[in-house]
């Protein structure tokens, strides 16, 4: 049995993904992606778009949580803004939030 199946069978975790816009004066998109990946609950973070002229970067972020999607992404936003001085704004596109299938649902 795979470890992911054991973990997911023990607790009720739900995976979500959403598009996130981050503004930063100091950090490059790859550094910001690494910082986002280090936040609790984040499983993947990929760069979707970057605009160096305005320092706005868009990421596709996948998380796993026991909370609702809105609560989990709000917590992610608070963590990013409080832990990292490099992050000036952190906006989750609420229309892009979607629930993903768990490994047992395929």
What are these regions (language model features)?
Residues 31-39, 71-81:
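Short amphipathic alpha-helices in soluble, non-transmembrane regions
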Residues 11-14, 48-55:
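Short, ordered beta-strand-loop transition motifs
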Residues 3-11, 95, 102-103:
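Proteolytic processing junctions in secreted/extracellular precursors
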Residues 44-48, 78-101:
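Conserved short beta-strand edge segments in small beta-sheet-based binding/regulatory domains
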Residues 12-24:
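Short glycine-/aliphatic-rich beta-strand segments at the starts of folded cytosolic domains
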Residues 57, 61-62, 66, 96-106:
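Short, low-order "capping/linker" segments at domain edges
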Residues 29-51:
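Short, flexible N-terminal segments of the mature chain
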Residues 25-26, 62-70:
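Helix N-cap motif at beta-to-alpha junctions
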